[in-house]
Amino acid sequence: MGQRLVVSVQNNGRELATIYYHWSAYTVSALYETETLVKCIFNHKDETEEELKLRLIRFCYENGGGIMGDHFEFEYIRSLYPNEIFKEDGYSRSYGLISISEQGMRESHKWSEGDVIIHIDEERISNGVFGYWDNIQEYNEEVASWGPGYEDDIKVFEDVPDIGYDLGDIEIKDIGKVIKAIENANEHIVRYGNEIYELTE
């Protein structure tokens, strides 16, 4: 079983699509998948949400993924785009399985072990694929509660690298910079100001 990531694409508070990745609910992997989706969404101008959904479906297929779930989702998508040809097999759940029906999106969320939301209208990303503590004291208290053998995990605040970005609320334009900041830190415990993040690895 993988670490299962679900990326939700939303506009004006409405969910348009979910994309499921079977092995990507790790902090950096999730951000890379999200960055690729962001480029797909924002590097083109769609006249309607239906056009955007179709482009996301094509994006999944082009990258080795496909349509999520059972025959219902496939038939639902085919009914919306009768002039398109969608293959029912030969794709991988590791490369993105899309749902756009209400039922399909609900089912996709049930599998999630890590969630990211792309807010198109706000040009922001809500990221939940990391551990969080309000401050270093809370983090160290939790580590101490784990018992003997975890002494090396206790951190001195000044030794924790500040990545300079809120990992839970990212502006679309900054996602590449956030990834680079995390990779440059080269630590699994990082911070933004006083907030402590544990990267899921």
Regions found by a protein language model. Give the residues of each.
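Short, extreme N-terminal segment that most often corresponds to the first beta-strand
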Residues: 1-33
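N-terminal interaction modules that seed assembly of large macromolecular complexes
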Residues: 28-33, 37-44
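Low-complexity intrinsically disordered segments
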Residues: 39-201
